[in-house]
Swiss-Prot record:
Subcellular location: Cell projection, Axon; Cell projection, Dendrite; Presynapse; Mitochondrion
Annotated region described as Mediates interaction with GLS, given as residue ranges: 190-371
Entry keyword Transport: yes
Annotated spans, Disordered: 1-54, 331-371
Function (record text): Functions in the development of neural tissues, particularly the postnatal maturation of the cerebellar cortex. May play a role in neurotransmission through regulation of glutaminase/GLS, an enzyme responsible for the production in neurons of the glutamate neurotransmitter. Alternatively, may regulate the localization of mitochondria within axons and dendrites.
Region described as Required for interaction with KLC1: spans on this chain: 115-120
Gene3D superfamilies with a match to the protein in the record: CRAL-TRIO lipid binding domain
Name listed for the protein in its UniProt record: Caytaxin
SMART domains: SEC14 (SM00516)
Gene Ontology cellular component annotations, sorted alphabetically: axon; cytoplasm; dendrite; growth cone; mitochondrial membrane; neuron projection; presynapse; synapse
Organism (species): Macaca fascicularis
Domain CRAL-TRIO: 171-328
Biological processes per GO annotation: apoptotic process; mitochondrion distribution; negative regulation of glutamate metabolic process; neuron projection development; protein localization to synapse; regulation of protein localization
Length: 371
């Protein structure tokens, strides 16, 4: 009963026979009675009336992989055998025959007429944006109220293979203590200007903390500004005693300067030297090398300094210029000839005639009486 009902339901089903062949697809044969794969093909023009559940189904062909020996010896059939190692001649590449692009070919990749620009790490400062101006050496600008414009108040530097942090907020008013003064001679021989008048006052409550961070700032600035040989111009004029750096601070600066910087220092010019700075250098002789002492020069005026170095990019503080003007004025006044003052004589004493000692001639009678 169930088989008859299933047969009636399948009478209206259109069943098409599919060819499952591993070969390339080809059109189905139109003629009946053609043997394919060794068996007669039935005419499929009319749909079948029954389903053949017990008939033989056509099977797919199964490809058998060849036996491959995966051993590492060069036996027959292994991966290292000569059959697998042989390659066609056209795949052999000679490395020496490969052409490498030259500099002209490399420039072809630059479009829109842009030229290749070479950049180096050499610090070049201009007079418009010198270190110590509104933009400091590290590019960390701060606002007038002391807050950082870019949110950074600290700068990490490496000095002597050790990492240090600089409190930029505390040393912001004193960053002009070290500036770049251009170059001298041929090459990149830098002029580093150290203005002592911008040092902090020793009466400040955080004086030692400020000097500690300012010391790191000065040393890291030398590392940043110096490319080859350099000289330091120390502006000592217009600096009161309370702003003078101590001997310990100067000694620490000298000891932590890299050996390359100490070797490349060609001259230390001290402008307007005072007795205090001379005394400090005299006391510092035990821990300062003789070569460093020989590099020190004393200059007593800016005019003399101009004879030694170019002054186009050297920034002289206003207080130093005023100090120089006062010194020149005092020098001119001291060189001016003074008028001679003659004391007036109130009473003239009468001249006294000299007394002549004239002896009277002795007569013969007087000689006789004396005898």
């Amino acid at each position: 009963m169930g088989t008859t009902e299933a047969t009636l339901r399948m009478e209206n089903v259109d069943v098409k026979e599919e060819w499952q062949d591993e070969d390339l697809p080809r059109p189905l044969p139109e003629e009946t009675g053609v043997e394919l794969l060794g068996s007669p093909v039935e005419d499929t023009s009319s749909p079948p009336n029954t389903l053949n559940f017990n008939g033989a189904h056509r099977k797919r062909k199964t490809l058998v992989a060849p036996d491959i020996n995966i051993s590492l010896d060069q036996s027959e059939g292994s991966l290292l055998s000569d059959d697998f190692l042989d390659t066609p001649d056209d795949l052999d590449i000679n490395v020496d025959d490969i052409e490498t692009p030259d500099e002209t070919d490399s420039l072809e990749f630059l479009g829109n007429g842009n030229e290749l620009e070479w950049g180096d790490d050499t610090p070049v400062a201009t007079a418009k944006n010198m270190p110590g101006d509104s933009a400091d050496l590290f590019g960390d600008g701060t606002t007038e109220d002391g807050g950082a414009a870019n949110g950074r108040l600290w700068r990490t530097v490496i000095i002597g293979e050790q990492e240090h942090r600089i409190d930029l907020h505390m040393i912001r008013p004193y960053m002009k203590v070290v500036t770049h003064g251009g170059y001298y001679g041929e090459g990149l021989n830098a002029i580093i200007v150290f203005a002592a008048c911008f040092l902090p006052d020793s009466s400040l409550p955080d004086y030692h903390y400020i000097m500690e961070n300012l010391f790191l700032y000065v040393i890291s600035s030398l590392e940043l500004l110096v490319a080859e040989d350099y000289m330091i111009v120390y502006l000592n004029g217009a600096t009161p005693r309370r702003r003078m750096p101590g001997i310990g601070w100067l000694k620490k600066c000298y000891q932590m300067i890299d050996r390359r910087l100490r070797k490349n220092l060609k001259s230390l010019i001290i402008v307007h030297p005072s007795w205090f700075i001379r005394t400090v250098l005299a006391i510092s002789r035990p821990f300062i090398s003789v070569k460093f002492i020989n590099k020190i020069q004393y200059v007593h005026s800016l005019e003399d300094l101009e004879q030694l170095i170019p002054m186009e990019h050297v920034q002289i503080p206003d207080c130093v210029l005023q100090y120089e003007e006062e010194r020149l004025k005092a020098r001119r006044e001291s060189a001016r000839p003074q008028p001679e003052f003659v004391m007036p004589r109130s009473e003239e004493k009468p001249e006294v005639a000299p007394v002549e000692n004239r002896s009277a001639p002795v007569t013969e009678d007087q000689e006789t009486s004396m005898s």
